[in-house]
C-alpha cells in the first residue's frame, strides 16, 4: 500500500506538478491535498521568508491531519525590483489578487526596463513535517532562472508562468508541458533534492 502524504495546499496547479514529479521519480506515494480533508485550517502565512511560511503551513496541517505533511512556499524574485514580489508573490496585487492582477502589476512595475535587465528566478522551499516531531523537519530549496517578458505567452501553467521565459528552452513555463516544466523548474528541482534526503519515500 502506498504511503499517504498530505501536500498542504489548495493550489491545484502546484498539486498536479508535485504528483507528476513524484511519479516521474518512481516514488510510490498517495498524495492528498487540503481539499481532501474535512474543514481544514487555513494557515496565515505571516513569515518573512519562504522557509518560515512553509513551516507555518506544514506544522498546522500536520497537527490537524496527523499525516506526514509536505508544504511549500514559492515566489518570483525579480532582480530589477530588488527581489520583489518575493514572499508576497501570490498576493502581489493586494487583497483582491488573482493571477491576472498579479501579472498586470508585475508588468507595470517593469515598464521601461529593457529585456536584458528583466532577469528573475523562481524559488521554492519545501518543508516535510511529521506530526509531533517538528524538530525533525526536513527543509530543501530549489530555483530556476529566467527573465520576465513584456507580454504573456502560452496557455498552460498558473501564476506568473506566462511571463517567465527560460532561455535554454526558448519557452515560457506556460508554453511547456508538465514534464518539460518539471525537468527544469524550481519545483521539479526541489523535489529531486527532497528525494535525496527522504529515503523513506524513494
Curated annotation (Swiss-Prot):
One GO cellular component this record assigns the protein to is: cytosol
**UniProt-listed Enzyme Commission number(s):** 3.6.1.66
**Which top EC class is named for this enzyme in its record?**
hydrolase
A Pfam family of the record is Ham1p_like
Residue positions binding substrate: 9-14, 74, 158-161, 181, 186-187
- Binding sites annotated in the UniProt record for Mg(2+): 73
Q: Does the keyword ATP-binding apply?
A: no
Cofactors demanded by this protein: Mg(2+)
* Active-site positions on this chain: 73
* Molecular-function annotations in GO: dITP diphosphatase activity; ITP diphosphatase activity; metal ion binding; nucleotide binding; ribonucleoside triphosphate phosphatase activity; XTP diphosphatase activity
Q: Which family does it belong to?
A: Belongs to the HAM1 NTPase family.
Task: Tell me, in a sentence or two, what this protein's role is.
Answer: Pyrophosphatase that catalyzes the hydrolysis of nucleoside triphosphates to their monophosphate derivatives, with a high preference for the non-canonical purine nucleotides XTP (xanthosine triphosphate), dITP (deoxyinosine triphosphate) and ITP. Seems to function as a house-cleaning enzyme that removes non-canonical purine nucleotides from the nucleotide pool, thus preventing their incorporation into DNA/RNA and avoiding chromosomal lesions.
Instruction: Tell me the HAMAP family matching this sequence.
Output: Non_canon_purine_NTPase
Identification of the protein by name: dITP/XTP pyrophosphatase
